[in-house]
Amino acid sequence: MTIMRKKHPLLKLINNSFIDLPTPSNISSWWNFGSLLGICLAIQILTGLFLAMHYTSDTTTAFSSVAHICRDVNYGWLIRYMHANGASMFFICLFIHVGRGIYYGSFMLLETWNIGIILLLTTMATAFVGYVLPWGXXSFWGATVITNLLSAIPYIGNTLVEWIWGGFSVXKATLTRFFAFHFILPFIITALVLVHLLFLHETGSNNPAGLNSNSDKIPFHPYYTTKDLLGALLLLMVLMILVLFFPHILGXPDNYTPAKPLXTPAHIXPEXYFLFAYAILRSVPNKLGGVLALILSILILATLPILNSSKQHGLIYRPITQTLYWIFITNILVLTWIGGQPAEYPFTTIGQVSSILYFTIIIILMPITNTVENNILKLH
């Protein structure tokens, strides 16, 4: 069997990625989130496939087909709530994964980091089109508001919006194409994940100490397979507590009323995981400016390797930048809270200050603290 797994063309790939992969001996539980994301993706694709068997992407029947899944399909309620709450778990793991990458300086693995940013954007797009499918009030107005942002693009904006809608408003054509996008995108994500892993295994994994670990590597199996299994069990435990006890806690009550194009909900707020980006979008009074701020809030991650001037890898021995990092994380939590609040004083002001701070920390303050720490430690 040993010979088989090392010689067979297919098994060799699996062996080199998950069994005999040389891994740093000191990577902590923050490195578990990659495998957890893989598990989340598998759960989402499987539950999504079973939901797609019963769902109809037509404006007249979409809402009732979701109700039918919950009421009449065997364990349909379980599949539906696993899919809905699984998306929230997916994004929580995704944000922790990115946060770990920033903290430990993993962004210096350029190809892996950039593919990761593309993955983040693709996952956000998938979640957005998926949110439209149940065709509740928040789905419909979410689709209208967010697609309408494209009209801010000069010259081609309005044409582009109508082209995406497939008409002069969000309707049957929009729902059908969003379902098609929502079905295909997870497979594109899976392909990108493989590319992400390919680039990661070219350089090897980073580690908490930020030092070269070539002299001290251990095989991935059994050490990290066991560690990942523990993480997976904890993830599934949290997910099942959400699904079985609090299935609606992360949803919007508005989505339990069918979409009505004539009546707008009191507050249009996106899903829990998009609130920080939504707060940044809202804090710019100009429409085009808001759209640019929204896109840049994610794309700014690509500037991290360029702006990094530190001679040390990661923040583990850098208390000043560490403090700044935790201010940054707190600021994102503040933005998340603001995104769920109505657009009125004092929330708008807090949102604007937080949005400015979000960009200032990455573009201005982080590079300054890098230089200061280099000078303190005389690392020229």
From Swiss-Prot:
Coiled-coil region: none
Locations listed in the record: Mitochondrion inner membrane
Cofactor note: Binds 2 heme b groups non-covalently.
Keyword terms, alphabetized: Electron transport, Heme, Iron, Membrane, Metal-binding, Mitochondrion, Mitochondrion inner membrane, Respiratory chain, Transmembrane, Transmembrane helix, Transport, Ubiquinone
One GO BP: mitochondrial electron transport, ubiquinol to cytochrome c
Transmembrane domains' residue ranges: 33-53, 77-98, 113-133, 178-198, 226-246, 288-308, 320-340, 347-367
InterPro entries assigned: Cyt_b/b6_C, Cyt_b/b6_C_sf, Cyt_b/b6_N, Cytb/b6-like_sf, Cytochrome_b, Cytochrome_b_C_euk/bac, Cytochrome_b_N_euk/bac, Di-haem_cyt_TM
Keyword Mitochondrion: yes
Keyword hit for Iron: yes
Sequence positions that bind heme b b562: 83, 182
PROSITE patterns recorded: CYTB_CTER, CYTB_NTER
GO cellular component: mitochondrial inner membrane; respiratory chain complex III
PANTHER family: CYTOCHROME B
Subunit (UniProt): The cytochrome bc1 complex contains 11 subunits: 3 respiratory subunits (MT-CYB, CYC1 and UQCRFS1), 2 core proteins (UQCRC1 and UQCRC2) and 6 low-molecular weight proteins (UQCRH/QCR6, UQCRB/QCR7, UQCRQ/QCR8, UQCR10/QCR9, UQCR11/QCR10 and a cleavage product of UQCRFS1). This cytochrome bc1 complex then forms a dimer.
Protein name per UniProt: Cytochrome b
Organism: Chilomys instans (Colombian forest mouse)
